[in-house]
Amino acid sequence: SVVAAAPAGVEVIVADNGSTDDSLAALAAGFPSVTVLRMDRNYGFAGGYNRALEHIEADYYLLLNSDVETPEGWLAPILDCLDRNPDVAVAAPKLISCADRTEFEYAGAAGGFIDYLGYPFCRGRILRCVEKDRGQYDDERDVFWVSGAAFCCRADVFRALGGFDGDFFAHMEEIDLCWRMQLA
């Protein structure tokens, strides 16, 4: 769905984090226009993206998990938000569950906040209770962090802040980066 929904002029690049299955052969056969950046081993979410993005020159970095589905037209509002708001460093869509398209995705949903103890929580989920999507997060809104599952940021800000902290192999790296964006 990513290749089909990509606007003209957007290059789709897959960062292969040391896969050992036949996924790259399937990718090459099904999507020859996709560029693949291969890594020698799994560097984790943070390390893998940091290594891949060192080789990509762009105004924006759009990071998508491999299981994210993208409908037609989904990227335009995100890029428009960043274009209209030069002080916004990162933007993201709300994430709907693939298993139940009436509910938010468990991981990230619609961005989130940090409480006074430093605990991150997200819109669309309270602890283990996932909300139904009733349009309550269709608005453009400032949040403290967005999910790394679908993360669109200014490349210059990403580079200036040193990218993701590689000490986070997987999980919470996007919250850390968004926190550093807030402080910058």
Model-inferred region functions:
Residues 1-9:
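Short, acidic, metal-binding catalytic loop of nucleotide-sugar glycosyltransferases
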Residues 39-56, 66:
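Glycine-rich, basic loop-to-helix element that forms the pyrophosphate-binding segment
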Residues 43, 68-69, 88, 95, ...:
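Acidic metal-phosphate-binding loop of nucleotide-sugar-dependent transferases
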Residues 112-143:
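Short, flexible, basic/aromatic active-site loop/helix in glycosyltransferases
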Residues 61:
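Short aromatic/hydrophobic "clamp" motif used to bind/position activated sugar donors
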Residues 16-25, 41:
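A conserved acidic beta->alpha catalytic loop
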Residues 138-184:
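A short, conserved alpha-helix in the catalytic core of glycosyltransferases
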Residues 72-119:
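Conserved donor NDP-sugar-binding/catalytic core segment of glycosyltransferases
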